[in-house]
């Protein structure tokens, strides 16, 4: 009875949570009765703590609504429920000790000059990129959580893991952190990280050297394959064909795949639909530009690593003006530190204004959300107040969605920051608006023309 109630509760949670949250935190749970107590089994401590902290009230409330005083007690545990049938052992484990004939290590690419059985993987997982030095915030929290679980259980629930977002937001850092985590747990694991262009280059070399079979065996024998910037596969038909079969072979063997891109999988032009579909089989997570608090934390961490005492007010000054990505922040701080070391002057706000004069001047010329809202309101002849209101009529909602999409494209603000600027809306509302307008620009000539006109107005 209580287990059946849990199935109903799952339905409620699926309605209330985003698809991403449900897939990451609720789907992995297993339920079983132990006397008058319903035990929820989580795959690891991280999921257990998260569900207990974030969702316990929703679960208990649902049980009380359905059964009143007869609602079961709730307990959490780690592992699989005792009655769960033991799975048949996979032909190849998620992280396995390789064949003695093949030296296992961390690899970068296929070598066409050696027989595949003797191919030696050169280490290219950067040991400096760890979970411990990845600064976490709302913008990347889900991405880090998913990466941690993959490192702990490669080939498990989130396979493939697809991370997408703009340049310099930490996607590559997470790839290396997962690789380091897997190797720490199993030093013999064969982990391959590469840029998508390297995969293409390796395939071309294999074709030139009549070594395509060795190429296939190499890539299909790894324990974990991480490919950065998958969007560069666009319009490379033969590479997509080979990757399609490699992808299928690795997933069938429960080997972990992580992919990154600068855009949502279905928005990658020039990539076959069958690949886009497979990219979404596991878990897809957006990595957004960091919010103010995270930008400050990144600056303080970087300064600490450099042995510099960065005043709080200086960190906030820089973080409020540079919003686009982590690399830009770190580059600006490096320039400040270099100038301070060269001149011997203390790091103050006035000193930072001088050291970053050209960079700050460029930022001040950028389009703001306020300008976008006013321009769109004037264009569609609606009130500025409507842009922030809760009104849902199409005459107001569509311009609001256009303004949100323009804000994402033309500013450095994160989705949560854009949502706040539109009357405190949730970041998922902004994401929906961006996807809706992208779709309408393909389907509606009027929306496409409106959007282009607004871009020209705002950029002039």
Swiss-Prot record:
Annotated InterPro entries:
AAA+_ATPase, Chromosome_initiator_DnaA, Chromosome_initiator_DnaA-like, Chromosome_initiator_DnaA_CS, DnaA_C, DnaA_dom, DnaA_N_dom, DnaA_N_sf
Q: Where is this region: Domain II?
A: 84-123
Q: Which GO terms describe its molecular function?
A: ATP binding; ATP hydrolysis activity; DNA replication origin binding; lipid binding
- Annotated region (Domain IV, binds dsDNA) at 341-460
In the record, the note on similarity to other proteins reads: Belongs to the DnaA family.
Localization per record: Cytoplasm
Q: What is this protein called?
A: Chromosomal replication initiator protein DnaA
């Amino acid at each position: 009875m209580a287990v059946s109630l849990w199935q109903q509760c799952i339905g409620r949670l699926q309605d209330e949570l985003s698809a991403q949250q449900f897939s990451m935190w609720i789907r992995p749970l297993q339920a079983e009765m132990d006397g008058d107590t319903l035990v929820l089994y989580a795959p690891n401590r991280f999921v257990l703590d998260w569900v207990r902290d974030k969702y316990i009230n929703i679960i208990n409330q649902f049980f009380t609504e359905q059964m009143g005083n007869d609602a079961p007690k709730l307990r959490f545990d780690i592992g699989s429920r005792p009655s769960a049938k033991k799975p048949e052992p996979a032909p190849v484990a998620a992280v396995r000790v390789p064949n003695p004939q093949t030296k296992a290590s961390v690899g970068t690419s296929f070598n066409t000059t050696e027989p595949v059985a003797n191919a030696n993987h050169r280490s290219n997982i950067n040991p400096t990129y760890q979970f411990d030095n990845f600064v976490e915030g709302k913008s990347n929290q889900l991405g880090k959580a998913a990466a941690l679980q993959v490192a702990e259980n490669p080939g498990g629930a989130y396979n493939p893991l697809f991370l997408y977002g703009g340049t310099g937001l930490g996607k590559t850092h997470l790839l290396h952190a997962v690789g380091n985590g897997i190797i720490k747990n199993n030093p013999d694991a064969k982990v391959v990280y590469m840029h998508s262009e390297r995969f293409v280059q390796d395939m071309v070399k294999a074709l030139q050297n009549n070594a395509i079979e060795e190429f296939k065996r190499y890539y299909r024998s790894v324990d974990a394959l991480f490919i950065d910037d998958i969007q560069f596969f666009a319009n490379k038909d033969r590479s997509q064909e080979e990757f399609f079969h490699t992808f299928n072979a690795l997933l069938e063997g429960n080997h972990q795949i992580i992919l990154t891109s600068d855009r949502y999988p279905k928005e990658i032009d020039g990539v076959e639909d069958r690949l886009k579909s497979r990219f979404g089989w596991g878990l897809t997570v957006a990595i957004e530009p960091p919010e103010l608090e995270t930008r400050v934390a990144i600056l303080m961490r970087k300064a600490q690593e450099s042995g510099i005492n960065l005043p709080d007010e200086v960190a906030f000054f820089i973080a409020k003006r540079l919003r686009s990505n982590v690399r830009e922040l770190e580059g600006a701080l490096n320039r400040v530190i270099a100038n301070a070391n060269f001149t011997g002057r203390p790091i103050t706000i006035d000193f930072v204004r001088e050291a970053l004069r050209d960079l700050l001047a460029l930022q001040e010329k950028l389009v703001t959300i306020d300008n976008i809202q006013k321009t769109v309101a004037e264009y569609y002849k609606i009130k500025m107040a409507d842009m922030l209101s809760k009104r849902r009529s199409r005459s107001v909602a569509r311009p609001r969605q256009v303004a949100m999409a323009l804000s994402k494209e033309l500013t450095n603000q994160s989705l949560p920051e854009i949502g706040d600027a539109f009357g405190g809306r949730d970041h998922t509302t902004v994401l929906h608006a961006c996807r809706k307008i992208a779709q309408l620009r393909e389907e509606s000539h009027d929306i496409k023309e409106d959007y282009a006109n607004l871009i020209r107005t705002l950029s002039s």
